[in-house]
């Protein structure tokens, strides 16, 4: 029987680092962010819906969506963010389910669904166990400002747009504390995999 793990965290919490560690161990990882990019490509149903909802001004010369421009709209307008999520989330969920079920049908021991908004989108029912990558907010803020060259306000707006990592940690089956070194995070992940008998 396949164990389905929901991996989540917050922006700049280190979730992608843990996801990469799982890939290195040859676990199949279904990445919601990658799928979210796929489903909004020209020719996809969600692309047409976004164009209809937000207008041509968010389209680049190559006909792809101008993600920074769309991002600046949705991070300052909650109604617009909800509107975008109502288009993108179902498309992402359906594609993730198809991929997950393919792995289950092929009897893989474990599959990871890497979903940043696992709890916000009420997607816990898609997985058997939840794993949250946690980091203190001050470290999260510093990492995000450095990584994306955001001002403190821009970084805080993006952090506040998501459920807090403390709330996510309370909902998780297991939490990986990513405040320390990458080596420490790797050690914690190894312990989790052993605990769940999938190392």
From Swiss-Prot:
Key words of the record: ATP-binding, Coenzyme A biosynthesis, Cytoplasm, Kinase, Nucleotide-binding, Transferase
The family classification in the record reads: Belongs to the CoaE family.
EC number(s): the record gives: 2.7.1.24
Q: What functional role does this protein have?
A: Catalyzes the phosphorylation of the 3'-hydroxyl group of dephosphocoenzyme A to form coenzyme A.
Q: Sorted alphabetically, which PANTHER family does this protein's record hold?
A: BIFUNCTIONAL COENZYME A SYNTHASE-RELATED, DEPHOSPHO-COA KINASE-RELATED
Q: Which CDD domains match?
A: DPCK
Identify the NCBIfam families for this entry.
dephospho-CoA kinase
GO process annotations (BP) = coenzyme A biosynthetic process
Record: residues binding ATP: 12-17
Work out whether the entry's keyword set contains Cytoplasm.
Answer: yes
**Reaction catalysed by this enzyme:** 3'-dephospho-CoA + ATP = ADP + CoA + H(+)
| Pfam families noted in UniProt | CoaE (PF01121)
**Gene Ontology annotations for the cellular component aspect, listed alphabetically:** cytoplasm
Q: Please report the name of this protein according to its UniProt entry.
A: Dephospho-CoA kinase
């Amino acid at each position: 029987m396949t164990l389905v793990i929901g991996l989540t965290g917050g922006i700049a919490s280190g979730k992608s680092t843990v996801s990469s560690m799982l890939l290195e161990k040859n676990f199949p990882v279904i990445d919601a962010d990658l799928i979210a990019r796929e489903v909004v490509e020209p020719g996809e149903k969600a692309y047409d819906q976004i164009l209809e909802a937000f207008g041509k001004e968010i389209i680049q010369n190559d006909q792809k969506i101008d993600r920074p421009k769309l991002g600046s709209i949705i991070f300052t307008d909650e109604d617009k963010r909800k509107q975008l999520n109502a288009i993108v989330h179902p498309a992402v969920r359906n594609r993730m389910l198809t991929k997950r079920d393919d792995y289950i049908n092929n009897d893989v021991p474990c599959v990871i669904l890497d979903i940043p908004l696992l709890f916000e989108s009420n997607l816990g029912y898609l997985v058997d166990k939840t794993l949250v990558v946690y980091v203190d907010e001050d470290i999260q803020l510093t990492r995000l400002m450095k990584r994306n060259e955001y001002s403190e306000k821009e970084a805080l707006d993006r952090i506040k747009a998501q459920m807090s990592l403390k709330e996510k940690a309370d909902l998780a089956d297991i939490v990986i504390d990513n405040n320390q070194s990458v080596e420490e995070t790797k050690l914690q992940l190894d312990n989790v995999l052993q605990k769940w008998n999938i190392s």
